[in-house]
Swiss-Prot record:
Binds 1 zinc ion per subunit. Residues 375-394 are annotated as: Disordered. Homodimer. Within each dimer, one monomer is responsible for RNA recognition and catalysis, while the other monomer binds to the replacement base PreQ1. Keywords: Glycosyltransferase, Metal-binding, Queuosine biosynthesis, Transferase, tRNA processing, Zinc. NCBIfam families: Q_tRNA_tgt (TIGR00430), tgt_general (TIGR00449). Its cofactor is Zn(2+). The gene is tgt. The keyword Transferase applies. It comes from the Bacteria. Belongs to the queuine tRNA-ribosyltransferase family. InterPro entries: ArchSynthase1/Queuine_TRR, TGT, TGT-like_sf, tRNA_ribo_trans-like. Substrate binds at D95, S96, G97, G98, F99, D149, Q190, G217. Zn(2+) binds at C305, C307, C310, H337. This is Queuine tRNA-ribosyltransferase.
Length: 394
């Protein structure tokens, strides 16, 4: 089975289904499990590339739909591709843009050939086919591209989910035929909450020469416990020689569960979007900084956190003042804190797997969340929604 030159994945250690590995790309190695901050418009909101890298991130996600419409892939290519354009020196992944074309655009239609829609920016008529998705992602120049897929809404009837799987497979073959030889391509497994459909679709896509396999179509309205259960069964079923990517998920609790199921890669807007909504995340749950109880609170967000916000002496009282006053600084400080939490979670998970103690590590994280306000964290608006359904609307 063919693989893309300059791209590889090697498993380093395993503890149960959880595993560590190294994802090698033309822009450097990425240790897994890894979390990819979301840079929808070509930046992780409020932070510089150096600040993002300081959280431990070595791969970020860009949104094809938005970059296609503005500034346009031809301009990005002319200016050296996304890495040069954004000044991000490490690995980069772009999604296909299909979800946004269907969910954000006006007067959209799904046909065999792809999506036909009108831009939410200027109403221009656009057609997103597998070939166009590959052309746009090729011009953008990320290390990893995603196939165009069909993501059925939560609660869709089984025939609709089955057809989404079939069409996604057909589109996957067309994406493989159209992709640039230098760009890795991941297939996207659909199937809703049906384990049988998920496994069958994973086998179909696993027979094709994708460089990695992703789980799409989660966090679209299904109960969180159901998502955890399905991922726990389908994760270990995916080809172990390729990286496994859970798209658009999620809370720290979600990530702890999914890592235990053998998932290697994650993205979600939760840490950045929630920060801009005044929510700081900790192992014990969330802190809603505007609440009056923090008005005179001298303590940092988390005394165990090594992020610049917590080690820099910024008190909860000061952060609350900034947020209530509408100061931009607080958005940066909370975003740094939240992304550092995710970076810490990934580092500690990798160490626990390598040392054969992931089960105990997971119990400690989940127990701390249960003892705090984990339920509030899970119910936060946008907390477990996918990249496409949250950050892409901004």
């Amino acid at each position: 089975m063919s693989r893309t030159p300059g791209f590889s994945f090697s498993e380093l250690a395993r503890d149960g289904h959880a595993r560590t590995g190294v994802l090698s790309t033309p822009h450097g190695d990425v240790l897994t499990p890894t979390f990819m901050p979301v840079g929808t418009q070509g930046s992780v909101k409020t932070l510089t590339p150096a600040e993002v890298a300081a959280t431990g991130a070595r791969i970020v996600l860009g949104n094809t739909y938005h970059l296609w419409l503005r500034p346009g892939p031809e301009l990005v290519a002319q200016l050296g591709g996304l890495h040069a354009f954004t000044r991000w020196p490490h690995a980069m992944l772009t999604d296909s843009g299909g979800f946004q074309a269907f969910s954000l655009a006006e007067r959209r239609t799904l046909v065999e050939d792809g999506f036909v829609f009108r831009s939410h920016l200027d109403g221009a008529r656009k057609a997103l086919t597998p070939e166009v998705a590959m052309e746009v992602q090729g011009l953008l120049g990320a290390d990893i591209a995603m196939q165009l897929d069909v993501c059925p809404p939560g609660g869709a009837p089984r025939p609709e989910v089955e057809e989404a799987c079939r069409l996604t497979t057909r589109w996957g073959k067309r994406c493989l035929a159209a992709k640039r030889p230098s760009q890795a391509l991941f297939g996207i497994v659909q199937g809703g909450t049906s384990v049988a459909l998920r496994m069958a679709h994973a086998d179909e896509l696993g027979a094709l020469p994708f460089d990695g396999l992703a789980l799409g179509g989660f966090s679209v309205g299904e109960p969180i416990a159901m998502m955890h259960e399905v991922v726990a069964q389908i994760g270990p079923h995916l080809d172990p020689t390729r990286p496994r990517y859970l798209m658009g998920v999620g809370t720290p609790i979600d990530l702890v569960h999914a890592i235990g199921a053998g998932v290697d890669m994650f993205d979600c807007v939760l840490p950045t979007r929630n920060a801009r909504n005044g929510q700081a995340l900790t192992q014990h749950g969330k802190i809603v900084i505007k609440q009056a109880r923090y008005k005179e609170d001298r303590s940092p967000l988390d005394p165990t956190c090594a992020c610049p916000t917590c080690t820099g002496g910024y008190s909860r009282a000061y952060l609350r003042h900034l947020y209530m006053a509408g100061e931009i600084l607080v958005l940066r400080l909370l975003t740094e804190h939240n992304l550092h939490l995710y970076g810490r979670l990934m580092r500690e998970a990798r160490a626990a797997i390598a040392e054969g103690r992931y089960a105990a590590f997971a119990r400690a994280w989940l127990g701390a969340s249960d003892a705090g306000n984990a339920n509030d964290a899970n119910e936060t608006v946008g907390a477990t929604e996918s990249t496409e359904s949250t950050e892409s609307t901004e």
